[in-house]
């Protein structure tokens, strides 16, 4: 296979979403070689996508590589630090590990990557590519040649008068140099202040623009047709079919030389958790719709109002009732966030007029030994044979584990009944004319409820 000179990167790693939504002709000018893992390749079951994979296989352009155990362990450790490990599947970890492995192989080490979230990168190393290395070697050779030539000694002649004049001249030059340094320092401070003010204004404007985007976001979509059915299923599973939500990419990255270290390996995926880990590791992300480098991604995460920790949204769609860090109940709120590829920082975008609802915090939970409890249960106290009202306040309570297990059983039971009623999704989408019977309802109640301090109306 001849190398593509118009490619953006040398190696492009493709996840399941790019392979399902686009064909080889869409990616052929994006990279010189394409990679994926065997598990992702076997995961694709869609008929049209399998036809596209047959084209990839016939051309021999898609390489199936399984990452090493060391790479998987490194990526898993980093994902645990970012908080995304709980929502990453084995295929997601393998894709990230393969990208990490190729990055180390093509750039001779992991000097471009972060060891842990928030680490500062060495800009001097990042800016030096292969051309820069050649220039450095040439400069070193010139310095060695200049050092090999012996320098002539300057012999000066003169007595005490010449020495006094020379010392006076050196004193004047030193004084002038000090004055120049002070003036330059004042100018530098003024310039730094003005630049800082400009940066603050730009950041304020940028954050306000982002907040406007999040507040004005609309969830309405198009009609689901047989043509976009696969994309609709992928969207429902929590992945992004447009490359990234709110991508901000740069057009100038198209024309950068392929020998630069930052243009060796890129990852194309629609999964936000994978994108989040990749950006915080400083791995390159490519928008598989436009072929441009993703600078920042925007999505939603869960933020605890008590401890301010941020967690990814569960992929299975199940609600999280307790904070994994502080154990707070009802404190997890959905929050818009953006991830920057340059710094790896996750920035939450909060509402400026947000007010926390303090309803239910006036009184503490009643004690089992209180007079009201004695009136309700009698002097015997807690009796297991009578109906109880056990308040769920912590995740490790046996009552919580019991209701979660019951809710999971109810969900599977209802799905089974619905599949039988619809007809299993046949070709003509046959629906039974009989009414649905046998559906069960089950709700998990956490805490005392919204109106815990309100007095109940007696009938």
Swiss-Prot record:
It is an enzyme of class 3 (hydrolase). Signal peptide: none annotated. Gene3D superfamilies: 5'-nuclease, Nin one binding (NOB1), Zn-ribbon-like. Residues 120-150, 165-194 have a biased composition (Basic and acidic residues). Pfam families: PIN_6 (PF17146), Zn_ribbon_NOB1 (PF08772). Residues 10-115 form the PINc domain. Residues 151-164, 373-385 have a biased composition (Basic residues). Residues 120-205, 366-385 are annotated as: Disordered. Changing residue 279 to R: Temperature-sensitive. GO terms for biological process: maturation of SSU-rRNA; maturation of SSU-rRNA from tricistronic rRNA transcript (SSU-rRNA, 5.8S rRNA, LSU-rRNA); proteasome assembly; ribosomal small subunit biogenesis. One of its GO terms (molecular function) is small ribosomal subunit rRNA binding. Keywords: Cytoplasm, Endoplasmic reticulum, Hydrolase, Metal-binding, Nuclease, Nucleus, Ribosome biogenesis, Zinc. It is found in: Cytoplasm; Nucleus, Nucleolus; Endoplasmic reticulum. Zn(2+) binds at residues 304, 307, 323, 326. Belongs to the NOB1 family. Present with 4490 molecules/cell in log phase SD medium. Component of the small ribosomal subunit, ribosomal RNA processing complex (SSU RRP complex). Interacts with PNO1. This is 20S-pre-rRNA D-site endonuclease NOB1. It comes from Saccharomyces cerevisiae (strain ATCC 204508 / S288c) (Baker's yeast). The gene is NOB1.
